[in-house]
């Protein structure tokens, strides 16, 4: 039986968060981007030092998902508004990552429901996120939770500028 458990994490697990970040990003985007762009991005964005700083910022929340006791993915939440959402109180899902071998086991669903419940507990008006417009699997997943596109933003992967969609749902 696959049982998903969620646990808030702090600085002590920043290295594990960095490892999961690098692995899931490579699994998801490596096949459709150049090796040079991927390496440049991974070396800048998912260092242990950077993740330690990120985890230590008040108001950020990292939630680790375990399947049968094994780390399977994580959620990174930021509590701030977006101008295109009228600057209403909001929660940004900055990352929702699941290792490939655990996809289809309820990890993503558990993490998404935790984000939505957190926003509701805090009486926020929106949950929003950015997603690469070419990531059809993720877009379909987000739509299944009621997310709709409300704008676009540029995203630099290595030396390659890409367009991300901004998606949101009301709480």
Language-model features: locations:
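Acetyl-CoA-dependent GNAT
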Residues: 8-14, 18-31, 39-101, 112-114, ...
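Active-site acidic-Proline motif in GNAT/NAT acetyltransferases
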Residues: 99-101, 105, 133-134
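K/E-rich alpha-helical interaction surfaces of small helical-bundle regulatory domains
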Residues: 24-28, 140, 148
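Conserved phosphate-binding and hydrolysis motifs of nucleotide-dependent enzymes
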Residues: 69, 73, 106-108, 146
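Short acidic-aromatic loop segments in the C-terminal HATPase_c
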Residues: 97, 147-148
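C-terminal "cap" of GNAT-fold acetyltransferases
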Residues: 3, 91, 125-139, 144-145, ...
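Conserved acetyl-CoA-binding loop-helix of GNAT-fold acetyltransferases
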Residues: 104-117, 140-144
């Amino acid at each position: 039986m696959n049982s998903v458990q969620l646990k808030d994490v702090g600085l002590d697990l920043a290295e594990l968060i960095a490892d999961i970040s690098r692995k899931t990003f490579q699994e998801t985007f490596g096949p459709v981007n150049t090796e040079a762009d991927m390496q440049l991005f991974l070396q800048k964005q998912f260092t242990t030092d950077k993740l330690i700083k990120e985890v230590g910022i008040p108001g950020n929340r990292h939630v680790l998902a375990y399947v049968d006791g094994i780390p399977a993915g994580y959620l990174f939440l930021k509590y701030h508004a977006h101008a295109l959402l009228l600057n209403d109180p909001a929660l940004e899902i900055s990352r929702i990552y699941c290792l490939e071998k655990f996809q289809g086991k309820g990890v993503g669903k558990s993490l998404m429901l935790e984000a939505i419940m957190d926003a509701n507990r805090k009486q926020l008006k929106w949950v929003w996120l950015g997603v690469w417009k070419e990531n059809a699997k993720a877009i379909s997943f987000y739509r299944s939770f009621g997310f709709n596109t409300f704008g676009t933003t540029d995203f630099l992967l290595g030396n390659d500028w890409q367009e991300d969609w901004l998606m949101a749902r009301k709480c």
